[in-house]
Curated annotation (Swiss-Prot):
It is found in: Cytoplasm. Poorly processive, error-prone DNA polymerase involved in untargeted mutagenesis. Copies undamaged DNA at stalled replication forks, which arise in vivo from mismatched or misaligned primer ends. These misaligned primers can be extended by PolIV. Exhibits no 3'-5' exonuclease (proofreading) activity. May be involved in translesional synthesis, in conjunction with the beta clamp from PolIII. One of its GO terms (biological process) is DNA-templated DNA replication. This is DNA polymerase IV. Residues 4-185 form the UmuC domain.
Length: 358
């Protein structure tokens, strides 16, 4: 039986700011963009959460909920540096590490000799070492499988840990709300609820063929998770699935012509980012994303095995047709990446200056 630890730093960006600027301690604090520039909250501390402030909320709304909110810009270089320190602690206990972001990771400690092989004691030791090294607290989940370890890390926050032993899995998943399963978002949860499926026990009792028919491959995954099954090994060399760039606009725009003024710069930046992080990867789709003035968003995508500049313009037109008169506050473009490498003879936009004269 495997021993998986999921480490999740507590309100990471905000915690770094409170550490570096002690005057922020005890005050509601958020890291994000300025409200007068239509910024969005990246992370907030627990004091801010008491007022209803949440990640991905507009800074304007956050300040409405909490007028005394201290809003600071992010310092990504600092967050990356501290993240490297945190990962150095992980490496003392295992070399099987799957980073998920700057502030969370899976660790497989099945064969680790530390703490007499106890995953619970290792999680505690890791959290203590992180605090000694960085002054930041972390929470941990311990379980035999990945998705339960991730769920468990959220059950005793902040600065705590939670263990799900193998024999507890059937009882634990029985009443587990489906929305708690990684990969089940609000839209999927609503579709499941429409079928009368609210928790894992509901899925266990639902006809498998109907679930697979309704959700395809994800239906198979959902059935596994509902039965406490997750055979996935840790992915130590996680390949990016996509590369994208987006911009939040200072003022809402409404016309296709206005969008066309912004799109070339986004495409150029997309090419630059791909050159840095996905130079040898083959693309398999192009995507345009719009977020409207009511904060609802839409995405349009199309299969493509090489970058087609004109396709972004076509997708933008299709997306804008869904605006129903609403203003556009955010515009983004991205490409989906396959696991395959680019053929050396295939046309590529990576690293090149794009000719955007259409």
């Amino acid at each position: 039986m495997r021993k998986i630890i999921h480490i999740d730093m507590d309100c990471y960006f905000a915690a770094v700011e409170m550490r570096d600027f002690p005057e922020f301690k005890g005050k509601p604090l958020a890291v994000g963009g300025r409200s007068d520039r239509r910024g969005v909250i990246s992370t907030c501390n627990y004091e801010a959460r008491k007022f209803g402030v949440r990640s991905a909320m507009s800074s304007h709304k956050a300040l409405q909920l909490c007028p005394d909110l201290v809003l600071v810009p992010g310092r990504m270089d600092v967050y990356k540096s501290v993240s490297a320190q945190i990962r150095s602690v992980f490496a003392r206990y295992t070399d099987i590490i799957e980073p998920l972001s700057l502030d969370e990771a899976y660790l497989d400690v099945t064969d680790s000799p530390h703490c007499k092989g106890s995953a619970t004691l290792m999680a505690k030791a890791i959290r203590e070492e992180i605090f000694e090294l960085t002054g930041l607290t972390a929470s941990a989940g311990i379980a035999p499988i990945k998705f339960l370890a991730k769920i468990a890390s959220d059950l005793n926050k902040p600065n705590g840990q939670y263990l799900i032993t193998p024999e507890r899995i059937p009882a634990f998943v029985k009443d587990l709300p489906l929305i708690k399963i990684p990969g089940v978002g609000k839209v999927t949860a609503a579709k499941l609820e429409a079928l009368g499926l609210l928790n894992c026990q509901d899925v266990q009792q639902y006809p498998k063929d109907k679930l697979i028919h309704a959700f395809g491959k994800f239906g198979v995954v959902l059935i596994d998770r509902a039965h406490g099954i997750d055979p996935r090994a840790l992915s130590m060399d996680r390949l990016r699935k996509s590369v994208g760039v987006e911009t939040t606009l200072a003022q809402d725009i409404y016309s296709l012509e206005q969008c066309h003024q912004i799109l070339p710069g986004l495409i150029q930046e997309l090419g630059s980012r791909c050159a840095k992080s996905a130079k040898q990867r083959q693309i398999h789709k192009q995507v345009v994303k719009l977020k409207f003035s009511d904060f609802k968003q839409t995405t349009i995508e199309h299969r493509s095995d090489e970058l087609n500049i004109n396709l972004f313009y076509e997708l933008l037109s299709q997306a804008l047709a869904r605006s129903q008169g609403r203003g556009i506050r955010l515009l983004g473009v991205s490409v989906g990446l396959s696991d395959n490498q680019v053929n050396e003879h295939a046309p590529s936009f990576y690293g090149a200056q794009l000719d955007l004269g259409l």
